[in-house]
Amino acid sequence: RKGRRDKIGKVKTAALKGSPQRRGVCTRVYTTTPKKPNSALRKVARVKLTSQVEVTAYIPGEAHNLQEHSMVLVRGGRVKDLPGVRYK
């Protein structure tokens, strides 16, 4: 009588709360190493967003001037060889 319910998909960028970007403050800027066949020092930052969620965001480009307390704009998009990094 009612039929099957559609599955509700999981949102990949939940911390953005549906926004295209979200502003945040860097709490820690550091480098990390990628998953197995790759080798590098990838630049990442822990960012506390205005939605009160703390996420790990990748810092794209060749150089950056980010420090603790820097204001950043975070967008969705994962880095395939860094586990847990789903924002840029």
Curated annotation (Swiss-Prot):
Region of interest: Disordered: 1-24
One Gene Ontology cellular component: small ribosomal subunit
GO biological process, one term: translation
Keyword Ubl conjugation on entry: no
Gene Ontology MF terms in the entry: rRNA binding; structural constituent of ribosome; tRNA binding
3-methylthioaspartic acid sites (modified residues): D81
A Pfam family reported for this protein in Swiss-Prot or TrEMBL: Ribosom_S12_S23
Keyword annotations from UniProtKB, A to Z: Methylation, Ribonucleoprotein, Ribosomal protein, RNA-binding, rRNA-binding, tRNA-binding
Keyword tRNA-binding: yes
Alphabetical list of Gene3D superfamilies matching this protein: Nucleic acid-binding proteins
Subunit structure as annotated in this protein's UniProt entry: Part of the 30S ribosomal subunit. Contacts proteins S8 and S17. May interact with IF1 in the 30S initiation complex.
Family, similarity comment: Belongs to the universal ribosomal protein uS12 family.
Functional note: With S4 and S5 plays an important role in translational accuracy.
Protein name, UniProt field: Small ribosomal subunit protein uS12
Organism: Mycobacterium szulgai
